[in-house]
Amino acid sequence: MSASVAARWVVLDIEGTLTPTSQVHVVLYDYARPRLGPWIHDHPEDPVVRKAVEDVKSEAGLPAEATAEQVVAVLHGWMDADRKAAPLKTLQGLIWQDGYARGELTTDYFADVVPALRAWRQRGLVLAVFSSGSVAGQVASFSHTTSGDLRGLFAQHFDTVNAGPKRERGSYEAIAAALGAARPLQIVFLSDVPAELDAAAQAGWHTVGLARPGEPYADADFGSHPAVGAFDDIDIEVVS
């Protein structure tokens, strides 16, 4: 499997595309889960935490006077269901940011990822990230990796708060506007989730699916999207 596209911007998913799913669902989720309650308890005056808690109550239909324990129970339920709720992602991102800063977390990537990203960047492609994880969490994850600090590789970061849901066309249109792309076809989106690729294609983007061996979407039907098993199989012609 191989794919050839012409683009100026490369927008990347993280889970299942840059990192193994286990990096998120085992390492990061297991790190955040027991820390959600203590984080809320220890940061009562943090406006970001307060808003996240209020949003949890609103989305879950909890009363305003609901306890922190009730809020945490909802958050744990969302984690169990793998629901990409914005307030959950905000709180997880804060916890992960702290974990990376403490040196307790390190991001590991598929072997083909970092060499490809560096090569694309050196050739003049502009790299950006679109993930359901918060921007704060994204930036932190690139700061402490098995390949060093990779933050300098990426020009912009997008999440479900500043762009929108990953399976909706409008989110990709918003990203294209933020990137300043004169034409949507100047952008290629790399993801392992067919529904996300569908939304990007509806917005006029190029798309490439990642069918990585052993990952949840390895045997998915990517339809009209070209699919590859690794970044080594993608040829991107740089356009202005």
Swiss-Prot record:
It holds the Pfam family Hydrolase. The keyword Metal-binding applies. Keywords: Amino-acid biosynthesis, Hydrolase, Magnesium, Metal-binding, Methionine biosynthesis. One of its GO terms (molecular function) is 2,3-diketo-5-methylthiopentyl-1-phosphate enolase activity. It comes from the Bacteria. It catalyses: 5-methylsulfanyl-2,3-dioxopentyl phosphate + H2O = 1,2-dihydroxy-5-(methylsulfanyl)pent-1-en-3-one + phosphate. InterPro entries: Enolase-ppase_E1 (IPR023943), HAD-like_sf (IPR036412), HAD_sf (IPR023214). Monomer. Belongs to the HAD-like hydrolase superfamily. MasA/MtnC family. Bifunctional enzyme that catalyzes the enolization of 2,3-diketo-5-methylthiopentyl-1-phosphate (DK-MTP-1-P) into the intermediate 2-hydroxy-3-keto-5-methylthiopentenyl-1-phosphate (HK-MTPenyl-1-P), which is then dephosphorylated to form the acireductone 1,2-dihydroxy-3-keto-5-methylthiopentene (DHK-MTPene). This is Enolase-phosphatase E1. It comes from Saccharopolyspora erythraea (strain ATCC 11635 / DSM 40517 / JCM 4748 / NBRC 13426 / NCIMB 8594 / NRRL 2338). The gene is mtnC.
